[in-house]
Curated annotation (Swiss-Prot):
Binds 1 heme group covalently. Belongs to the cytochrome f family. This is Cytochrome f. The 4 large subunits of the cytochrome b6-f complex are cytochrome b6, subunit IV (17 kDa polypeptide, petD), cytochrome f and the Rieske protein, while the 4 small subunits are PetG, PetL, PetM and PetN. The complex functions as a dimer. One of its GO terms (molecular function) is electron transfer activity.
Length: 320
């Protein structure tokens, strides 16, 4: 949920309270209707920054592990699996946008090398379709065929996400070459802490916006709190709004400092990224390599036979 910190003097209290209430209602509806990874799609042309950082980390502040597994070597025009694992404790519950507790969702963004793309349905085997399940993969941009997003989906069911990938064929694609390619992935579990506009969700710590003494803590009927801080220097009052799902750590009469945490950290999720490398191998090189190995094996066999023949001749001479 989006929140605002309001500063006001006593004659303005009624107007400021009404404005704050309307703002919370409007922004709450917005946060519920929006979902990751749409935030990244709407705000960034490319999900991977020049530094290598995936932009999802701008909203998901906690660092958690993510792993991707791909074959070491693949052939041209071949369908292979890219398996993304997003591990977490299935017993964990997160704070939802309405303030209630619920299970964690997961999401991922897969950045393939240029020329690699999602395999068409008619190229996916029944076994691979079973691994994919009912997942829906969406292009990051309509004109981009090598970057895909998935989610949010229930983490209980999709801790492991399987992407069906089609490798390019350098014979028909001039931009593809027989090289080693990196594949990047970013994955998150749980909701983010920051919205793209910079405002906080209700899944993070809220800090005091002023020093002073807690004059009053008001519990709102629809959830959340209003913490009124009286500034000791000029007797102004500052209202800090806590969205639904968060409980204050302070009590009335407490002295607090600027940026002191007013709540605990409710976040149990996090974001991580990983990279894997895959070699697009030329089939002719494989054939040459197989021929080379076969030649070595045949040479070894001939040497063994020649040795046995020589030993047999020597044994015959000895017997004579």
């Amino acid at each position: 949920m989006h929140t605002k910190n309001l500063f006001y003097s006593r004659p303005q209290q009624i107007t400021q309270y009404l404005s704050a209430f309307l703002m919370m209602v409007i922004l709450t509806r917005t946060s519920i209707s929006s979902a990751y990874p749409l935030f990244a799609q709407q705000g960034y042309e490319n999900p991977r920054e020049a530094t290598g950082r995936i932009v999802c980390a701008n909203c998901h502040l906690a660092n958690k592990p993510v792993n991707i597994e791909v074959p070491q070597v693949i052939l041209p025009d071949t369908v292979f699996e890219a398996v993304v694992q997003i591990p977490y404790d299935l017993q964990l519950k997160q704070v939802l946008s309405n303030g209630k507790k619920g299970g964690l969702n997961v999401g991922a963004v897969l950045i393939l090398p240029e020329g690699f793309e999602l395999a068409p349905p008619d190229r996916i085997s029944p076994e691979l379709k079973e691994k994919i399940g009912k997942l829906y993969f969406q292009s990051y941009r309509p004109n981009i065929k090598n970057i895909f997003v998935v989610g949010p989906v229930p983490g209980q069911k999709y801790k492991k996400i399987t992407f069906p990938i089609l490798s390019p064929n350098p014979a028909t694609n001039r931009r593809a070459h027989f090289l080693k390619y990196p594949i990047y992935v970013g994955g998150n579990r749980g909701r983010g802490q920051i919205y793209p506009d910079g405002s906080k969700s209700n899944n993070t710590v809220f800090n005091a916006t002023a020093s002073g003494r807690v004059k009053k803590i008001i519990r709102n009927e629809k959830g959340g709190y209003e913490i009124i801080i009286k500034d000791g220097s000029d007797s102004n009052e500052v209202v800090n709004l806590l969205p639904p799902g968060l409980e204050p750590l302070v009590s009335e009469g407490d002295s607090i400092k600027l940026d002191q945490p007013l709540t605990s950290n409710p976040n149990v999720g996090g974001f991580g990224q990983d990279v894997a490398e895959v070699v697009l191998q030329d089939p002719s090189r494989v054939q040459v390599l197989l021929f080379f190995f076969a030649s070595i094996i045949l040479a070894q066999i001939f040497l063994v036979l020649k040795k046995k023949q020589f030993e047999k001749v020597q044994l015959t001479k000895i017997n004579l």
